[in-house]
Amino acid sequence: MRKLAILGAVIFLLLLLGQWSGNQPERDATAAARAELGIAFEERFVDVGDVTLHVVFAGPENGPPVILLHGFPEFWYAWRGPAAVLARAGFRVVLPDQRGYNLSEKPAGLAAYRLDRLVGDIVGLVDALGYERVRLGAQDRGGAVAWRMAIEHPDRIERFAVVDASHPLASASADEDTISWYRTFMQIPWLPGYAARLGNWRLLASNLRATSAPGAFAEEEMDQFRSAWDRDGAIHTMGKWYRADAWPLESDGRVATPTLVILAENDRFIPAGFTRASLEFLDDGELLELGSGTHWVAGEEPERIGKILVDFFSRNAEWTAAPLGGTL
């Protein structure tokens, strides 16, 4: 009993210290992105049905719509660099904070974070903005949402590009296996969120920097992430994505939408075999191996990723993107 009491006291102190040490001031990521990139990012809240999402926009209102979905532990801000390239080319870029993240609504309960709800949010966003079809891009956990949307709502997607996220059935057909410690850790209720807060979010910040290219995630950028993680207990609702992960796929997983799968060379989270195996499920797909970059390549090489997306999203369209110059 004494050992249990000591253990309980240690856990309580850990939770208390984590809560205190992770407190952050409010920061305006939209204003920071405007100042950094010279793009007129604007923000508003959009009712998508079950929840209200915080959404940032860039580019001309009459441009072809592109929705970009962030992953864990990021938020819309992670896509700001490629979004600026797309906006300059004439696309209307839509950057939602997905449910449970940053300024978007954070419903209670685990069922609210099932994949069908997350997909429903993006379909609802397309409807709320008055679009019939969009070009869709995604990274990491945003890719899980985007893949399912491409499988189950192909009529809403014009073209689909995914970075560092494999098809949901690809792991079964690849010759690799992986055990992700952080996915296992995130299955534990509450504790990961408090542990993440310790030492000014040291666990998350150090993991991002250890798995990214040298120089990525500068301190100013990391401060924006810290504020997003702290806002209204977001770190806890972000974790619910992992605990509510299971949602059986009731089809063969075929994707008819033209799809570009982008593979970074040094992704330490998604095995390359999984990414390559994704092509087996595509009726009209292509694989682009970058030869550089990590799991966070959209932030490491924003100009390059942005130009790749401009090229892919402009294909077979009556609309022509504005010239950007440079090479991919």
Give a label for each model feature.
Residues 293-302, 306:
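Catalytic histidine-centered segment of alpha/beta-hydrolase-like enzymes
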Residues 14-55, 65, 92-94, 101-137, ...:
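Flexible "cap/lid" subdomain of the alpha/beta-hydrolase fold that forms the substrate-access gate
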Residues 320-324:
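C-terminal amphipathic helix plus adjacent low-complexity
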Residues 1-12:
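N-terminal Sec-pathway targeting helices
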Residues 58-103:
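Conserved HGGG/HGGXW glycine-rich cap/lid loop of the alpha/beta-hydrolase fold
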Residues 75, 203, 234, 304-305:
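Short phosphate-engaging motifs
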